[in-house]
Amino acid sequence: MKKSRFLLFTSMLLVFWNASFAQQKKQAERSGNPVFPGWYADPEGIIFDNTYWIYPTYSDDYGKPDRSAGFSELQLKTQKNTINPQYLKQTFINAFSSKDLTHWEKHPHVLDIKDVKWAAYSIWAPSITRKDGKYYLFFGANDIQNNNQLGGIGVAVADKPAGPFIDHIGKPLVDKFYNNAQPIDQFVFKDTDGQYYLIYGGWRHCNIGKLNKDFTGFVPFKDSTVFKSITPENYVEGAYMITRKGKYYLMWSEGNWTGPDYSVAYAMSDSPLGPFKRIGKVLQQDPAIATGAGHHSVIHVPNTDDWYIVYHRRPLNTTDGNHREVCIDRMYFDKNGFILPVKITNEGVEKRVLKR
């Protein structure tokens, strides 16, 4: 009798262990949200050579503080302009790479202000592209409040997506307010005809400009203007653009970045220059999961109609505006080409290895 009970108990343990292992394996096949630890924001997601990459803003310390090694006299002087001491921590960019969306490798300080002499703090919202075998990382720096301050949008270059990135032109690419747009939150967009554009802007204004061939400046439009305003209704910051089936989708963030209602909306047009009429929100908080879901990017899997939205959000156990995490969820379109509201999840997305 004791032997039978022992066998029954052992069998039950095996069943429980197998079920637990199967559940763990099932969970391991998904990314989970957040996809990697740390307080990060404004993530740029992209694919290079069958590898997923994410370039976020360093939002706050998570465990051991991460810092740049030191600052020049010019950088220390420029740091006195900051409107928020928290921004003084944001002097570098860390990157993350993955082969399958579930296991991420950290690449520390792919960009650091030691390699950008005019940049001193508020290194924000990186955007990256590859051109002619080089990688170009666009970034905001110094959070300028007026045209008399040093800073704006910069561009750095490297031979590899993991850097190290060094200053490309030795000065900001955009260093002033045009059309009342603060020079932050830049996105480099390659059109189907090969033309590269810079789309950017804070303070509720969004601009677009045509980049020249070597990314050292801009090519004026036919009317001689360098930047055109494409600001849609309710725009705040965080511009992003994709194309799908001949349509241009301008996406942006609305609301206050420190609050629960931070969100993403979008518009559609037949041209990257607009006009863009707001359609509605595509990403926002779920009070049961997380708040402040915003400042996003989009990953499109080549040769498919599969799309992922990469974004930051704030966990429910904190109201600190700087405590943001990078998450990934699926993004879908309806039969008419409109973006369906994204369901934010704790599970994240399924493991996916890119085909060679």
Predicted feature descriptions by range:
Residues 21-356:
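Carbohydrate-active catalytic/glycan-binding domains of CAZyme proteins
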